[in-house]
């Protein structure tokens, strides 16, 4: 697919650049000087546009994990399947990931131990990296050095209109990784973003897919979900979408009895 990003000057978005992590900028500069492309990516940019102070700053690059590791002696490789690199500055950790493709070329579609569909996850281009991300508001890249946002899928528009939209077909993307349903609840409650009717229906109709997901992954998402500080909203939305009864079959019975 030929995808041309909309390049948006940061100055037009009223972003407070002072709150961008100096360490993340250091990492990007060093990658750039070594001949690689590197961007701030994802939730940190979404939050900057919303004028929320980001908790973490993640970097995406075309450098591969071993190449990144060689450049930063304060770094270590993390993760079995996707090797991420964590670079430590004092008590701050910058997570650096290589652009990945989710190649649909391989017909053997398997589930890994974590219940996600896996294809051969190879490294890819920035365009491929965009398409494997879940929500459009998170598929956004910031070129810190040129002060431009690369927007491939209408991310800025979604963030401004507070909409949570999956990239691609709702049902396909949920089947590919059912945990996206929990993430949809997390982002919509945390950010006050609305879900389209088709996405609401897709979640409602596919809530039973959470049964295939190992409890360790659900637990991880659950912690993030309830750490938001919007527990009541989250709880009501989880019931509305039929997600709670899939995760805690007995809990909902109890609650109905009381």
What does each of the following model-derived ranges do?
Residues 1-258:
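Catalytic cores of the polymerase beta-like nucleotidyltransferase superfamily
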């Amino acid at each position: 697919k030929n995808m041309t990003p909309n390049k948006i000057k940061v100055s037009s978005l009223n972003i407070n650049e002072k709150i961008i992590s100096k360490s993340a900028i250091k990492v990007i500069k060093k990658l750039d000087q070594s001949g690689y492309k590197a961007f701030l990516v994802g939730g940190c940019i979404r939050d900057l546009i919303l004028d929320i102070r980001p908790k973490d700053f993640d970097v995406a690059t075309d450098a591969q994990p071993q190449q990144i590791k060689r450049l930063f002696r304060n770094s270590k490789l993390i993760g079995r399947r996707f090797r991420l690199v964590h670079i430590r500055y004092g008590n701050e950790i910058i997570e650096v990931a290589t652009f990945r493709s989710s190649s649909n070329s391989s017909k053997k579609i398997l589930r890994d131990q974590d219940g996600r569909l896996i294809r051969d996850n190879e490294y890819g281009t920035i365009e491929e990296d965009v398409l494997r991300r879940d929500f459009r508001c998170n598929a956004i890249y910031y070129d810190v050095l040129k002060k431009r946002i690369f927007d491939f899928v209408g991310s800025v528009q979604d963030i401004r209109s507070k909409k949570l939209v999956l990239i691609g077909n709702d049902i396909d993307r949920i089947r590919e990784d059912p945990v996206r349903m929990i993430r949809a609840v997390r982002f919509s409650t945390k950010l006050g973003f609305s879900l389209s009717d088709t996405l609401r229906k897709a979640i409602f109709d596919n809530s039973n897919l959470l049964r295939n997901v190992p409890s360790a992954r659900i637990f991880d998402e659950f912690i993030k979900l309830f750490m938001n500080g919007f527990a009541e909203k989250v709880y009501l939305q989880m019931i509305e979408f039929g997600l709670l009864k899939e995760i805690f079959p007995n809990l909902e019975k109890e609650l109905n009895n009381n």
